[in-house]
Amino acid sequence: MYRCLGEALLLSRAGPAALGSAAADSAALLGRTRGQPATAPQPGLAPPARRHYSEAAADREDDPNFFKMVEGFFDRGASIVEDKLVEDLKTRESEEQKRNRVRGILRIIKPCNHVLSLSFPIRRDDGSWEVIEGYRAQHSQHRTPCKGGIRYSTDVSVDEVKALASLMTYKCAVVDVPFGGAKAGVKINPKNYTDNELEKITRRFTMELAKKGFIGPGIDVPAPDMSTGEREMSWIADTYASTIGHYDINAHACVTGKPISQGGIHGRISATGRGVFHGIENFINEASYMSILGMTPGFGDKTFVVQGFGNVGLHSMRYLHRFGAKCVGVGESDGSIWNPDGIDPKELEDFKLQHGTILGFPKAKIYEGSILEADCDILIPAASEKQLTKSNAPRVKAKIIAEGANGPTTPEADKIFLERNIMVIPDLYLNAGGVTVSYFEWLKNLNHVSYGRLTFKYERDSNYHLLMSVQESLERKFGKHGGTIPIVPTAEFQDRISGASEKDIVHSGLAYTMERSARQIMRTAMKYNLGLDLRTAAYVNAIEKVFKVYNEAGVTFT
């Protein structure tokens, strides 16, 4: 199935013309025919044209079904990697048996395994009763526990939670976090409920998940998402620990994104936005990719626009601003603002906290039109899914699209961006900072000790002993005739001498994770000649890892 699709896709799409005019190192990285193993060029032969996967899909809607959209991206990756998976199987089976095995496991990976649909009543503060709807989808249990956020939104649907759960599976695989994918949603507008009512909804939803076996430190671990945060996660942890987890010493590991006092971890609030920054950093500093885009490496002369000024948008903006990029526009659901001279994230954050909106910010003007189409180098869609579509993709002016949100780009828009030589840094890599630091928090809860507590003093003393040893060695060699020879550490080293704090360890671990994963995606793109199609490279990377788990573990009762 996947091979047939892949063969069809290999027929009729030529790579972007811009690739042929790139620098030599860029051409070596990105200029070959996409999707085929690297071979020496043959004089006089042009690369075979190829179709993009969205052209092969039956669904050509500008607003596709979200889960079908993710499945389409998966199919594209599967069609690219199937032959390699068959080739790498080290068994005595025939070629046909190997291919059947590979296709069978790919069919296991693709669908969403479990979807729990709930409805429960609450009594509101005015005495009226209301029935609340909620969902929890578990896409894959190839690794346990499952992991994924809980969002509160009137747009929540079965299709949405299935799509987001599947993205979580691939996201965890891309950054080597050993979780399966899951997602939950409660169909409410939290602005219409009091804090007391939201606590009732959250605690009751937790109990419903617990009764059905959809929450637990080793089963399924929720996290914050749209319109939820530390407060809601604290309610969930307390509800679970006070009921079904009463005798479980690891009960507070049932959820991540908690306050520090409830077992949370330093750096979790900003983790997704910081991950977005590190993801962009890894690609924007790669000279070969920047030469393809006609840009210079680094943040120094870059402008960017953020759509969505929530947790992800704010922290992405803060870190890019801190490293020299200039934010020229910010968009929200009620309007957008623009200032070509730059917008300060702290000033805008303070204004929004005071007024509840970014509109009216004195150091920017109202932007007429779609902020997604504003003139900038980097566009960060950090709001909701399916924001970049076939309709607006031709008008996007950014050279880099950094997907801070889940699923902001439809398949048709993705095709257009590839044709226009626009680099899309995909969601399943770029916004994985949240689940990465959630993994660190989960490990902290299981270990029952904060990061660095056992080593703070030892590391500090070791550093001072090292400096003293160097000083004494120099004095023995050159003598003390001119006095002692003090060893003065630099400011950066002085900050580290006292030992790494938990936040330092978390930030370092996140930066390393994003860097390593970016390199894996780049190598995969080169290996399969995918050019600027980083999304397919990320999906291929994820599929290879999930496939390996299923293949080596074996399939029970088949």
UniProtKB/Swiss-Prot annotation:
The protein's Enzyme Commission number? 1.4.1.3
Q: Indicate the residues annotated as transit peptide.
A: 1-53
Highest taxon in the source lineage: Eukaryota
User: Where in the sequence is Phosphoserine found?
Assistant: S79, S128, S227, S384
Q: Which GO terms describe its molecular function?
A: ATP binding; glutamate dehydrogenase (NAD+) activity; glutamate dehydrogenase (NADP+) activity; glutamate dehydrogenase [NAD(P)+] activity; GTP binding
Q: Which residues carry this modification: Phosphotyrosine?
A: Y135, Y512
What the protein does comes down to: Mitochondrial glutamate dehydrogenase that converts L-glutamate into alpha-ketoglutarate. Plays a key role in glutamine anaplerosis by producing alpha-ketoglutarate, an important intermediate in the tricarboxylic acid cycle. Plays a role in insulin homeostasis. May be involved in learning and memory reactions by increasing the turnover of the excitatory neurotransmitter glutamate.
Q: Where are the transmembrane segments?
A: none
**The protein, known as:** Glutamate dehydrogenase 1, mitochondrial
Where does the entry say this protein is expressed, by tissue?
Answer: Liver, brain and thyroid.
Binding annotation for substrate: K147, K171, S438
* Source organism (scientific name): Sus scrofa
Q: Which residues carry this modification: Phosphothreonine?
A: T410
The organism's lineage? Eukaryota, Metazoa, Chordata, Craniata, Vertebrata
Just give the chief location class. Answer: mitochondrion
GO annotations under biological process? glutamate catabolic process; glutamine metabolic process; tricarboxylic acid metabolic process
Which InterPro entries does the record match to this protein? Aminoacid_DH-like_N_sf, Glu/Leu/Phe/Val/Trp_DH, Glu/Leu/Phe/Val/Trp_DH_C, Glu/Leu/Phe/Val/Trp_DH_dimer, Glu/Leu/Phe/Val_DH_AS, NAD(P)-bd_dom_sf, NAD_bind_Glu_DH
Cysteine disulfide links = none
How does this polypeptide assemble, per the annotation? Homohexamer. Interacts with HADH; this interaction inhibits the activation of GLUD1.
Q: Which family does it belong to?
A: Belongs to the Glu/Leu/Phe/Val dehydrogenases family.
Q: Encoded by which gene?
A: GLUD1
Activity regulation description: Subject to allosteric regulation. Activated by ADP. Inhibited by GTP and ATP. ADP can occupy the NADH binding site and activate the enzyme. Inhibited by SIRT4. Inhibited by HADH.
GO cellular-component term (any): mitochondrion
